[in-house]
Amino acid sequence: MPQQNYLDELTPAFTPLLAIKEASRCLLCHDAPCSQACPAQTDPGKFIRSIYFRNFKGAAETIRENNALGAVCARVCPTEKLCQSGCTRAGVDAPIDIGRLQRFVTDFEQQTGMEIYQPGTKTLGKVAIIGAGPAGLQASVTLTNQGYDVTIYEKEAHPGGWLRNGIPQFRLPQSVLDAEIARIEKMGVTIKCNNEIGKTLTLEQLKAENRAVLVTVGLSSGSGLPLFEHSDVEIAVDFLLRARQAQGDISIPQSALIIGGGDVAMDVASTLKVLGCQAVTCVAREELDEFPASEKEFASARELGVSIIDGFTPVAVEGNKVTFKHVRLSGELTMAADKIILAVGQHARLDDFAKLEPQRNTIKTQNYQTRDPQVFAAGDIVEGDKTVVYAVKTGKEAAEAIHHYLEGACSC
């Protein structure tokens, strides 16, 4: 792979002709499996047909009907595990590149100034959302379309959550995220940044001022390991935030060792390679057949030159040297690097939601409703997958649950 820039997307975009050519490979399945496999119900089968018939506006309308973050999901979704996994075309040669087609459509939407979303009526009262990540943003759109006056309270200086603070710009450009958020604000959604529960406002205050409250705080804090408690290591989320805020203008070591095998570990490793680190190695306790990273992330990291060692877990650390033991076999492996980064998981900060009785990183809900009937939860803090598209799914479903509750249409 040629030398990359942190601000340039790794995957090239389709031109209109290439998009139509790719869409023409679609077998136009009845009850398309790809559409059944999208958690956000984005309906790839339908928008691919529209692309094939040169109806790009219709394709954009299909995507936006169920996904307020269509341009984001087009870039970061593990499509090989979701919509593309059911593509019938795979039985002929290769599945349709659904992610790049969705990216083409949403880019076309932005470039041509389409205005698919309309301002909300705000006739059904006020709803507050805590957290401006993917679940909160999607929920705000669904609630606004239903007629609610929605305000999102975000603790950071800018909205977006992990989309802004964690995902590298060569995977998700800031301009793409900014355009998605601007589209949502144009509907009439109010986003108030620098507002954190427990500091500038309380949950009880929001309950008093709104008909319902939706909690969508994410897993924004990186986890460590006791073994490295006194070592000079950096947590993955801190490294990614530092690189993102500096737009890649950070000092880079000659060699780096990343402990972990998920998508965050791949993002760290890829960022280091893109920024010029000569030797980057990821060591994960999972073996390759159970590797947690998506195939797309894994392949991208390998193409950039990242070395992957599977099936090893750290057992000792001394300075810049880490000793690993294989999870099944005997024998040890010792590696040294200028920098060690831990990518072993993330957790939520739920201390200010004690009344909702959170357990570790989860708030228990029934149909997204917490033990407090006025308070709902969605996103990473409810049980389930931790992908952006799943957060979109839960945000939309939680908004629908709020609407049913407020309108007295359910027994919850």
Curated annotation (Swiss-Prot):
Organism: Escherichia coli O157:H7
Enzyme class: oxidoreductase
Name used for this protein in its record: NAD-dependent dihydropyrimidine dehydrogenase subunit PreT
Positions annotated to bind NAD(+): 286
UniProt KW keywords: NAD, Oxidoreductase
Record-stated family: Belongs to the NADH dehydrogenase family.
GO MF annotation: an example: iron-sulfur cluster binding
A Pfam short name: Fer4_20
Entry EC number(s): 1.3.1.1
Reported function: Involved in pyrimidine base degradation. Catalyzes physiologically the reduction of uracil to 5,6-dihydrouracil (DHU) by using NADH as a specific cosubstrate. It also catalyzes the reverse reaction and the reduction of thymine to 5,6-dihydrothymine (DHT).
Gene this chain is encoded by: preT
Catalysed reaction equations from the record: 5,6-dihydrouracil + NAD(+) = uracil + NADH + H(+); 5,6-dihydrothymine + NAD(+) = thymine + NADH + H(+)
Subunit structure: Heterotetramer of 2 PreA and 2 PreT subunits.
Superkingdom of origin organism: Bacteria
Sequence intervals crossing the membrane: none
